[in-house]
């Protein structure tokens, strides 16, 4: 991977992360029970990755660094949920409903389980 690609990913990721932080700082205090900033980041990312995939599909003349900046960098920094959404919708559009269910179940359940395991690991390490 070249320097331009790395720079594109890094710059996009920084901007995406800053936007996610801004969503959290601005929206999370409005309704503390449901982190609206995270929801806004995930919904925005899902929408934008769909738009980006379609845009880059029809504008293949753009340099690969543009896609890396937008999708891998910016949307990856904003949320990885956008990638999950794009992959799931792709399976749905292909009519692969069983795999769609498996992917949804794996991502959601896996993320929750890993979060719990992470919490438990840190708690265990703090006690030993």
From Swiss-Prot:
Name the NCBIfam families on file.
crcB (TIGR00494), PRK14196.1 (NF010792)
Identify the domain of life. Answer: Bacteria
Q: Into which family does the record put it? A: Belongs to the fluoride channel Fluc/FEX (TC 1.A.43) family.
Query: Which GO biological process categories is it annotated with?
Result: cellular detoxification of fluoride
Q: How is its activity regulated?
A: Na(+) is not transported, but it plays an essential structural role and its presence is essential for fluoride channel function.
State where it is primarily located: membrane
Gene behind this protein:
fluC
> What protein am I looking at?
Fluoride-specific ion channel FluC
Subcellular localization is given as: Cell inner membrane
What InterPro entries does the annotation carry? FluC
- One Pfam family name is CRCB
Which catalysed reactions does the entry list for this protein?
A: fluoride(in) = fluoride(out)
Quote the record's binding site residues for Na(+).
76, 79
Q: What does this protein do?
A: Fluoride-specific ion channel. Important for reducing fluoride concentration in the cell, thus reducing its toxicity.
Which terms does the record give in the GO molecular function aspect? fluoride channel activity; metal ion binding
* Membrane topology field: Multi-pass membrane protein
> What keywords is this UniProt entry annotated with?
Cell inner membrane, Cell membrane, Ion channel, Ion transport, Membrane, Metal-binding, Sodium, Transmembrane, Transmembrane helix, Transport
GO cellular component terms? plasma membrane
Residues spanning the membrane: 3-23, 33-53, 69-89, 99-119
């Amino acid at each position: 991977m070249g320097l331009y690609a790395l720079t594109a990913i890094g710059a996009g990721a920084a901007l995406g992360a800053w936007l996610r932080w801004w969503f959290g700082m601005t929206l999370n205090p409005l309704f503390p029970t449901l982190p609206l900033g995270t929801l806004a980041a995930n919904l925005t990312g899902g929408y934008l990755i769909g738009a980006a995939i379609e845009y880059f599909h029809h504008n293949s003349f753009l340099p690969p660094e543009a896609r890396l900046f937008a999708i891998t960098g910016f949307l990856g920094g904003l949320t990885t949920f956008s990638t999950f959404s794009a992959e799931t919708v792709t399976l749905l559009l292909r009519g692969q409903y069983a795999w769609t269910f498996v992917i949804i179940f794996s991502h959601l359940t896996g993320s929750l389980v890993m979060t719990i395991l992470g919490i438990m690991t840190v708690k265990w390490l703090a006690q030993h």
